[in-house]
Amino acid sequence: MTAKSIKEAVLRDPTDFGDVDYPTALVNVTNVCNLSCSHCFVFRDNNPNSARDKMDDATMMRQFEILRDKHNIKSMLFMGGEPMIRKDLVMEAAKLFDIPAIVTNATYGIPKLPGGLVTVSLDGPEQMNDPIRG
């Protein structure tokens, strides 16, 4: 498949990345965040990923199942914005994958993710971190 044909296929069906297995994938479950970090793509001017209408949880769960089954995805990385704003969705979707992972700012707590990976984003010691985080 060419880049153009992949793009056209994805526009028709968001789970169509060709007839290929992908061991790992990532998804931004939301572009909403409770912080306003100076370096974050969510808060850049003219960001095409800015917060807007979200996919409802049931639809997103179906998409996760389709992606897992269609592309044999074993590991899923949940990102955002702040993915734990949609904690119920993320924790339920994490059960679908052998190796779930979450990137979080930990302001909603650090989730328990047995068999998975939780990455907490920090920008240095408190005196450096806090001004960056807004």
Regions found by a protein language model. Give the residues of each.
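Radical SAM enzyme core and accessory elements
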Residues: M1-D19
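Radical SAM/AdoMet-radical enzyme domain recognition
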Residues: M61-I66, K70-F78, R86-G134
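Phosphate-binding glycine-rich loops and adjacent basic patches that engage nucleotide phosphates
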Residues: A3, D21-V29, R52-D56, N105-P111, ...
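Short secondary-structure boundary micro-motifs
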Residues: A9-T15, D53-K54, T59-M61, L67, ...
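Canonical Radical SAM [4Fe-4S] cluster-binding loop centered on the CxxxCxxC motif
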Residues: D16-T59, H71
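A short, structure-level motif marking secondary-structure boundaries and short turns
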Residues: L11-R12, P48-S50, S75, D130
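A short alpha-helix capping/helix-coil boundary motif
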Residues: I6-K7, V42-F43, P125-E126
